[in-house]
Amino acid sequence: MVYFGKTLNRDNMEDSVKMSDIDGLGMKPANLDWANMGFGYVATRSHVRMTWMDGRWSEPELINEPYIKMSIAATCLHYGQEAFEGLKAFRCKDGKVRVFRPWENIRRMNNTADYILMPQVPEELYLKCIQMVVRDNQDYVPPYGTGGSLYIRPLLIGTGAQIGVSPAKMFDFIILVTPVGAYYKGGLTPVEALVITDFDRAAPRGTGHIKVGGNYAASLLPSKKAKEQHYPITLFLDPETHTYIDEFGTSNFFAINKDN
C-alpha cells in the first residue's frame, strides 16, 4: 500500500512532499498518453517478489510499494551479484495480452545465475511470477496499434549480508513492469552509430556472455561520449581482435549482405 503520512521510513518526509513527486507514483492508466509514450519508468500497481533462503524459494507475493529493504552489506550492492532480464507483453488485435518468448528469458537468467553462484528460479515458478504481475497490471498494457508494450523486468539479487567476497545466503527474485513506447521513436528510420574502438563492451572470459548489470554500467561512459558527438547509439567491436562487429550498445547486430 502506498502511504502518504509522516512515518514513511524515507527520512521522515513531510506531508507536503508527495511520494509521487519523487518516484513517479500515482500515474493511472487512464491518464497515460499511449500515443506518445517514451521508454522510461512509470510506476504501476504492483511488482512480484519472493525470497530464497535455506535452499528453497518462498511463495511469490504481489507488493504495492516500489521499494526494497535489504542489508547495507548485501552482495548485490558490493560485489554485483545480480542478474536481470527484459521481455515484453503486448495487447493483440483480439484484445488478449501475450508475453513474447518468456522461456528464452527464463533460461538465460538461470544460465547467468549458475555463472555467478545464485540459485536458479524453477521455470514454472518463474512463469507463474510473470503471469501474476502481468495479470495484476494488465490495464497498463498499451492498446493494440499504439506500438507500445508492457516492459517486464525480472531481477535476481543477492540480499544476504556478506563482507568477504563470497556468495550470499539469501536472494530476492523480483519482477517489475512498466508501460513503454518504442525504444526508437523513429521506428525503422536509419540512425548513425559511433563505432567504439577504445573500449570493450564485454570481457570474453568474464561476464560478457551473461546478463549482469556491471556489463551495462561499464558501457555508460562510451555511450555518453557518443551522444556528445550526436550519435544516438554505439557499435562495439569484438574484444579479442577489435576487427569484427560485436553488437550495439542497446541491441544485437544483424546484417543483410545480399539483396533478394
Q: What is each residue range found by the language model?
A:
Residues 142-153, 157:
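Extended, Lys/Arg-enriched charged tracts that mediate electrostatic binding to polyanionic substrates
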